[in-house]
Swiss-Prot record:
Any one Pfam family match given in the protein's UniProt record, by short name: EF_TS
Domain of life: Bacteria
Single GO MF descriptor: translation elongation factor activity
Location of the region described as Involved in Mg(2+) ion dislocation from EF-Tu in the Swiss-Prot/TrEMBL record: 80-83
Location within or outside the cell: Cytoplasm
Gene from which the chain derives: tsf
PANTHER family: ELONGATION FACTOR TS, ELONGATION FACTOR TS, MITOCHONDRIAL
Stated name of the protein: Elongation factor Ts
UniProt function note: Associates with the EF-Tu.GDP complex and induces the exchange of GDP to GTP. It remains bound to the aminoacyl-tRNA.EF-Tu.GTP complex up to the GTP hydrolysis stage on the ribosome.
Length: 294
């Protein structure tokens, strides 16, 4: 049997970018044959990627790419916060958002089919899953192209905002930061979704009914609650986060700036995170190990 040296492991890792232990196992299985070890790794890492693909991805990052009036905002998910800080994962997300801005794919499937570094995006993704050991997937994106100016703001890597505007760049950047902090659901009161208003109205009606007031007073209480809600969730009517003496609309008017629209992505929003029972997980791993050695 051929002795597996550190140099051999290092050479295989340089060729495949696979973890050290995986390289050593592959070389041992291949009895030192480098080409055979590469083939073994391709099979193993592909299998690893397939197993990971069914796992929940509720962590990740939001990436942005802006160039004057063209740009994109993209969320890429992984399983843990630790991997969301991995350099290879970050590079993959940034490569993907640039492709969205440049190539204008119709959807995530089209993005995965685009070429990237001599492979498709999906092939790069699968190799990254094999290397890192977690499921990774672009979740959604939005591309921007038109006559409006664009500005982006990333709060760390978990919240991303793109604002479409006309006017002053600094004012627009301030608005992007405000959006990340205050999370409005619409530009103006008229833009708030009807279903959101219906939910708020239902809650307001129940609360007002419990007051025991006459019907006409109850109706006024409900309408007052709705108007308060609309002001709180519409960007232009919110109190500006950097100056509580004025609304966002007043700040923009003073800066001669108009917001045409905005998009905000928050990592994992709407995804139900998997809740693991750690003790049960450890017990299952111990049982599996015992079975394997039995």
């Amino acid at each position: 049997m051929v002795a597996i040296t550190a140099a051999m492991v290092g050479e295989l890792r340089a060729k495949t970018d696979a973890p050290m232990m995986e390289c050593k196992k592959a070389l041992t299985e291949a009895d030192g044959d480098m080409a055979r070890a590469e083939e073994i790794l391709r099979v193993k890492l592909g299998s690893k990627a397939g197993k990971a693909a069914s796992r929940v991805t509720a962590e990740g990052i939001v990436a942005a790419s802006i160039n004057s009036t063209t740009g994109a905002l993209l969320e890429v998910n992984c399983e843990t916060d630790f991997v969301s800080k991995n350099d290879d994962f970050l590079a993959f997300a940034n490569d993907c958002v640039k492709l969205v801005a440049e190539k204008n794919p119709a959807d995530v499937a089209a993005l995965l089919a685009l070429p990237l570094n001599g492979q498709t995006v999906d092939e790069v993704r699968s190799a990254l899953i094999g290397k890192i050991g977690e499921n990774i997937m672009p979740r959604h994106f939005k591309r921007f192209a038109g006559s409006n100016k664009l500005v982006s703001y990333l709060h760390g890597t978990r919240i991303g905002v793109v604002v479409e505007f006309e006017g002053d760049d600094t004012a627009a950047k301030d608005v992007a930061m405000h959006i990340a902090a205050m999370k409005p659901v619409a530009l103006s009161m008229a833009d708030v979704p009807a279903e959101a208003i219906a939910v708020e109205r239902s809650v307001a009606v129940q609360k007002a009914a419990e007051s025991g007031k006459p019907p006409e007073i109850v109706e006024k209480m409900v309408e007052g609650s709705i108007q308060k809600y609309l002001k709180e969730v519409s960007l232009l009517n919110q109190t500006f986060v950097k100056n509580d003496k004025q609304t966002v609309e007043q700040m923009l008017k003073a800066a001669n700036t108009t917001i045409k629209g905005f998009t905000m992505f928050v990592v994992g929003e709407g995804i139900e995170k998997r809740q693991d029972d750690f003790a049960a997980e450890v017990a299952a791993q111990v049982a599996a190990a015992s079975k394997a050695t039995a």
